[in-house]
């Protein structure tokens, strides 16, 4: 199992660096381009959600990122310093916010949201 874990500032360059490092590990484990794309999309959506909505782009606020990569699955977990997500307000695809979470929910095998922590689990089939 590979574990990629990092606490980063709410900064686009830090986010890009973490995402690139995580994707390199993911690509080494899985050669299925569709699966890798799905994981990239999940990673991007969850971290950008923390950047934009959770931490409101405030640089000093932290984003905790954890990616667990195993032969059978990948888990992406993100925690920010925001107030949390009201998942019930994310059901409308035409709403101003919530499309990213709805997308992640649709392509994940399991999505768990608890206040300001969100985790997506995807099994490799």
PLM segments and residue spans:
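Conserved polar catalytic motif of the HATPase_c/GHKL fold
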Residues: 45-49
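STAS-typified acidic loop motif
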Residues: 5-16
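Conserved beta-strand-loop-beta-strand hairpin that lines the nucleotide-binding pocket
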Residues: 1-4, 51-125
